[in-house]
Design a protein with these regions (language model features):
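A short, active-site helix/loop in glycosyltransferases that binds the activated sugar's phosphate group
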Residues: 103-120, 244
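Short alpha-helical segment that forms part of, or immediately flanks, the ligand-binding pocket
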Residues: 286, 309-313
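Conserved small/polar residues in nucleotide/adenosyl-binding loops
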Residues: 315-322
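N-terminal pre-catalytic "stem/leader" segment of glycosyltransferase-like enzymes
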Residues: 1-76, 227-232, 240, 258
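Short, polar loop motifs at secondary-structure junctions
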Residues: 63-67, 87-88, 106-111, 262-268
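Nucleotide-sugar donor-binding catalytic core of glycosyltransferases
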Residues: 1-12, 117-304, 321
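Active-site proximal beta-strand in glycosyltransferases
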Residues: 72-87, 102-105, 124-127, 153
Length: 323
């Protein structure tokens, strides 16, 4: 199993152990690369060593890795990828057609797009939750720490941190700025259909490329329109939408109800809203859900139909404060 200590990997390990699966965990973020000689070497070394005198049956990663897929293809070993992120640009790598692949995607719309395109190595699978861990954590009282109590809560990035990609387009013309703002506002009114990518054409796209050029990978079919729409515009939309929702809640209900925001940008101030700063998704987030009367699920529009992990966790975390 290749990965990095991101949210959820511990749950996968617990699942493997419960099932009696033997595994080796290789912690290396470079497995996310499309090509990486360091990963090639680690892969070959691990496969050669085996595990407790036995050969490996398969290789597993969270999210899809072209470099892992190609290594699995070389030795004809199954590669299982459990995709929990969207956008996931690696899914447009030519390597997805490798016959060794078993790629499980949580966004059914993205799965259908690939499946209808003739990709037979993809499968639909909603995100999983470690219910046993949730039960252990929440116990009988679910932690009554005041840090986690609220009437309304939101956990997630506001996408207004210093690495906001949309701000790097500030050099475009006033016409392009107005156009981009208009299509972002239009997309805010529509759920279930993501059309920003289709609206980036001709002079608008040329202006964006001139001011902040992006390059597509040579080993894939993703377009510059896909990159701009999903990584620039969708996140700017999320910034505006999440801020406006929290601001409206704070203005209308902040005096009478406790409204908490848990986000990496701890300096953000919104009247009527308590910014609690960042929270650990593995060790703390379930307590927030369990101690909130209402938890908001404000989803990135690049997720077309998938149920986000926060919603999956909510299904397993009945609140003691429910009326």
């Amino acid at each position: 199993m290749f990965g990095s200590r991101n949210f959820g990997i511990e749950d996968v390990e617990e699942c493997f152990m419960k099932k009696g699966y033997k595994y080796t965990y290789i912690d290396d973020t470079s497995y996310r690369d499309r090509v990486n000689r360091q990963i090639d070497a680690k892969f070959a070394d691990s496969i050669e060593k085996g595990i407790e005198g036995e050969k490996y049956d398969c290789v597993f990663t969270f999210n899809y890795s072209p470099v892992i897929s190609n290594n699995c293809k070389k030795i004809n070993i199954p590669y299982i990828s459990f995709v929990y992120d969207n956008p996931q640009i690696q899914l447009y790598s030519y390597t997805v057609i490798n016959s060794c692949n078993y790629i499980f995607i949580f966004d059914k719309a993205q799965y259908m797009e690939l499946k209808n395109g003739g990709i037979n190595t993809v499968f639909y699978a909603p995100l999983a939750v470690n219910i046993d861990r949730m039960n252990r954590m929440l116990g009988t009282n679910g932690s009554c720490n005041d840090r986690y109590k609220s009437d309304v809560s939101f956990v997630g990035s506001m996408y207004n941190e210093k690495h906001n990609l949309f701000q790097r387009l500030e050099g475009v013309s006033e016409y392009t700025k107005g156009y981009l703002d208009a299509i972002i506002q239009a997309q805010r009114q529509v759920y279930g259909l993501f059309f920003l990518e289709d609206l980036l054409k001709d002079r608008i796209l040329d202006d964006m490329l001139k001011n902040y050029p992006v390059e597509v990978n040579t080993d894939g079919v993703e377009s510059v329109e896909y990159i701009y729409a999903n990584y620039f515009l969708a996140r700017e939309l999320a910034t505006e939408e999440r801020y406006d929702i929290m601001k409206k809640l704070g203005t209308e209900f902040g005096k009478d109800y406790l409204i908490n925001l848990y986000t990496p940008n701890g300096s953000l101030k919104i009247d009527g809203v308590m910014n609690k700063g960042p929270i650990d998704y593995y060790n703390e987030m379930p307590y927030v859900f369990n101690n909130s009367r209402i938890n908001l699920n404000i989803t990135l529009r690049s997720i077309k139909s998938g149920i986000p992990l926060r919603a999956c966790l909510l299904y397993t975390s009945p609140s003691p404060r429910d009326s």
